[in-house]
Amino acid sequence: MNKIRIISFFVFLGIFTCVFQLGSMSTVSEEESALFMEEFEKLVLDIDGFGIFVHNTTIALPMFIPGFGIFWGLFSSWSTGYAFAAIVTSMPEIANISPLSILFLSPFGLMEIFSYSLAISRSFILIKAIITKTNLLQFIKPTIIEIGIVVTLLLAGGYVEFYLIELVQNESIEMPGF
């Protein structure tokens, strides 16, 4: 069982990454970008570390739903990539930053992609068990543990992301391309 768990995690990590990259390669018109940025600015106006955590958790928890979680996770991945494309359209100076570098080279990006991949792969394992009519009782404890891991990582990630945003806004650190 552990081998299947590890393999499914890495398979969905790869799929999540590819779908995110495809979303980030989307062509976004100036009008769509302006509309997105207006909504995005409203969303993050008074957000803090806990707000980021709540936002990311409301995205992550449905990913545990058997079957549905796979589609929800991949839609979330594409949407996040598309959001990056919209931001690049409105801020061309960040066009040279690889979207995958934000995902894999930032501490909060790693925590988020690990969490989402864990949740999506658990959704796959659960739907596979349902289809094969496997007793689901054996999956309760590992699923609860994984939900705990995801919530903990997203809590830490939310505060790390907020802290880094604050540092960049206060110009306490310089990030290449910003």
Pin down the residues of each PLM region.
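Mid-length scaffold segments of soluble, non-membrane domains
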Residues: 77-86, 96-110
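Interfacial helix-start motif at the membrane-water boundary
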Residues: 42-70
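Transmembrane alpha-helix/helix-exit interface in multi-pass inner-membrane proteins
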Residues: 24-28, 67-90
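Alpha-helical transmembrane segments of multipass membrane proteins
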Residues: 60-64, 87, 159
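Alpha-helical transmembrane segments of helical membrane proteins, especially in multi-pass transport
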Residues: 104-126
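Perimembrane loop-to-helix junctions flanking transmembrane segments
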Residues: 31-49, 176
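N-terminal signal-anchor transmembrane alpha helix
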Residues: 1-30
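Terminal transmembrane helical module of multi-pass membrane proteins
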Residues: 125-178
